[in-house]
A protein has these predicted regions:
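Single conserved hydrophobic/aromatic residue that forms the stacking wall/gate
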Residues: 149-158
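Binding-site signature for planar aromatic cofactors or substrates
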Residues: 1-150
Length: 158
């Protein structure tokens, strides 16, 4: 059964809306085909909004946790450390649903949360975090990329 078939045709109350959002975000974690797998995460840098698409790695409705991974060398770490306010938004035109969440972001480095995230990461993801110079560095020649061994990624929570 497709996700669209599991959702109501008409939302009559907030409980139905929340249940649908829970279902959509729960399915977005493992399903790379849904647009909610890669929502836009916005933070603040020097009084300006900075937005980027990030991969949703965990959704826990009861604890109000969304987990995303990022390289601890990325500029967003400094942004989040200085101002934890954040917004996450996703939209799927086929479902005709937008989900917007606001909250505060926590950065986890070298702690149990980060270790768990690293251990659950795929070899491909780990390779992305081991590019010398950081994952946001422009690469002129992909064949000339060298890697270093990193033990843990940063794991921001929204």
């Amino acid at each position: 059964m497709e996700l669209k078939d599991k959702l109501p045709n008409l939302y009559k109350n907030i409980d139905e809306t929340l249940e649908s959002a829970k279902l959509i975000l729960s399915e977005a974690v493992p399903n790379t085909q849904t647009l909610f797998h890669t929502p836009v995460v916005s933070t603040i840098h020097e009084n300006k909004i900075v937005s980027r698409v990030m991969v949703l790695r965990e959704f826990n409705f009861d604890n109000k946790i969304l987990r995303f991974h990022t390289d601890n060398r990325a500029a967003k770490i400094d942004n989040i450390t200085k101002n934890s306010s954040s917004t996450v938004i996703g939209y799927d035109p086929d479902l005709k649903i937008q989900i917007k969440m606001q909250g505060h972001t926590e950065v986890h480095i070298d702690d149990e949360v980060a270790k768990m995230a690293w251990n659950e990461s795929t070899p491909r993801s780990k390779k992305c975090y081991s590019v010398k110079g950081g994952s946001t560095k422009e690469i002129g020649d992909p064949q000339a990329v060298s890697y270093t061994h990193l033990t843990l990624p940063t794991t921001p929570y929204v």
